[in-house]
Amino acid sequence: MNNLSKLLTVFLTVTLFVGPMFSDQLRSEETGYTPTTLITGANRGIGLEFTKQYLEKGWKVIATCRNPNRADELNNLKQNYPDHLSIMQLDVIDHNRIDELALQLSDTPIDVLLNNAGISGGSSKQIFGTMDYKVYEDVLAVNTIGPMKMAEAFYPHVKNSQLKKIITVSSSEGSIDKALKRGARLFFYRSSKTALNMLMVNLALQLKSRGIAVGMVNPGATDTDFMTGLPFPMRPPEVAVADMIRNIENITVDNTAAYVNYNGKTIPW
């Protein structure tokens, strides 16, 4: 085998077996390309940590939240990353605003659309016999309908990027298999995530032929305001987000519709 053939063999091996795993890192660090992510709910908790870690990786971040003027930590980050961090107002239940922002960013490719915004609804509001159905509507609006609307509005931006990923922060609480083992709880939150998962699977099937990967990642029980009061052992946000970013890097068109736990294992439906 001559040298050219050897080089070709090595290139193909790396592309087929190593490339998908490290494609995001290679594109951002070795090719000079600067990827962009748009993150919802970026002012605190997991969304804020996503913002920090993607900025540290050299990405451009469009951080969205309902009240940017009150997002002190985001605004402090802006001072350190003036050229890489944009902070924009967005509430995922406001579909008109989603459309406005999509139009405003029409010339901006978005490599990873990161649907992070979510609410639990509060455990006391979803107890059988005393359920607050207005709260249920709110949970569905944020956790289920919001990510679908975001995906539809920002599809052109993702399509025009290099990495082409639509990622949603889901939960193992959306797994019917796990619910059967864990028992009844969190009616609103669980069902919102189960419905979200089905939407994202449908979206993955719809967009696979267009080269767009769709995936769901689970942070596990994480020590944030979102999880306050829940009787679970908690993981630090820094660790949870680092795990999810690693899993996002591994989601490609080949394994689109992936439903991935923080440890990299597939969550049963």
Q: Where are the predicted features?
A:
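Conserved glycine-rich Rossmann-like NAD(P)H-binding loop of the short-chain dehydrogenase/reductase
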Residues: 57-73
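Catalytic loop of short-chain dehydrogenase/reductase
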Residues: 119-120, 127-140, 145, 155, ...
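C-terminal helical subdomain
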Residues: 209, 216-219, 224, 228-269
